[in-house]
């Protein structure tokens, strides 16, 4: 029996509000995170991902309080990311009620941090988030590079090699966002999703670019993703989670109804 594919609404939170941007800029407000999370919990989302996109020092306390409030209302797995830099940060978020933490820039800065995190808390709690951008020219073999700091800082690191290294270090899941597709609504970058899904032994969550329900199906069937993450199609009422699940099931994708 194949494992059911997961639908994960994503809350990008900036200064205590859910927002949605295009290619990491051009932000619009999508509501109060606790209310938004409750709505998805009621709709039957499989998980929720909460990414603190400001994640500045002054924002941390607010984030912890928001995570506590969400965890009190929501009974599906909650992943929290943004500004997770130390083992203490991980402990704080897990104690606040997160089930998993997502590590991005801190992993690039110190890959051993991922190893220590997986050893300390278990791989099942550790998600490594990868923001990948295509850097190969037309006609060259496709190549994607890791960017950090909300997609602003190039690292020179190959995305596929990095995904393999991170799973070797104990990451239990890869959250893959295509920087080229983020917010565009024209579908996932299926090539990089497939390349990473084929390269690593852990689940891959596809993110960046969902504009319709067919894109979710494509992410799973063509991209090989184990889970699909979406924000604006759910936040702004274009589709509901049950509609997405029904659509996917009708097209032969195993989902939890």
Curated annotation (Swiss-Prot):
Catalytic activity: 5-[(5-phospho-1-deoxy-D-ribulos-1-ylimino)methylamino]-1-(5-phospho-beta-D-ribosyl)imidazole-4-carboxamide + L-glutamine = D-erythro-1-(imidazol-4-yl)glycerol 3-phosphate + 5-amino-1-(5-phospho-beta-D-ribosyl)imidazole-4-carboxamide + L-glutamate + H(+)
Major localization class: cytoplasm
Pfam families assigned: His_biosynth
InterPro entries assigned to the protein according to its UniProt record, in alphabetical order: Aldolase_TIM, His_biosynth, HisF, IGPS_HisA/HisF, RibuloseP-bd_barrel
Alphabetical GO biological process terms: L-histidine biosynthetic process
Annotated catalytic residues: 12, 131
Residue runs in coiled coils: none
EC number: 4.3.2.10
Enzyme's top EC category: lyase
Pathway this chain belongs to: Amino-acid biosynthesis; L-histidine biosynthesis; L-histidine from 5-phospho-alpha-D-ribose 1-diphosphate: step 5/9
Protein keywords: Amino-acid biosynthesis, Cytoplasm, Histidine biosynthesis, Lyase
MF-aspect GO terms: imidazoleglycerol-phosphate synthase activity; lyase activity
Superkingdom of the organism of origin: Bacteria
GO cellular component: cytoplasm
Locations listed in the record: Cytoplasm
Entry-linked CDD domains: HisF (cd04731)
Record function comment: IGPS catalyzes the conversion of PRFAR and glutamine to IGP, AICAR and glutamate. The HisF subunit catalyzes the cyclization activity that produces IGP and AICAR from PRFAR using the ammonia provided by the HisH subunit.
Annotated family: Belongs to the HisA/HisF family.
Subunit details: Heterodimer of HisH and HisF.
Protein name from the UniProt record: Imidazole glycerol phosphate synthase subunit HisF
Lineage: Bacteria, Pseudomonadati, Pseudomonadota, Gammaproteobacteria, Cellvibrionales
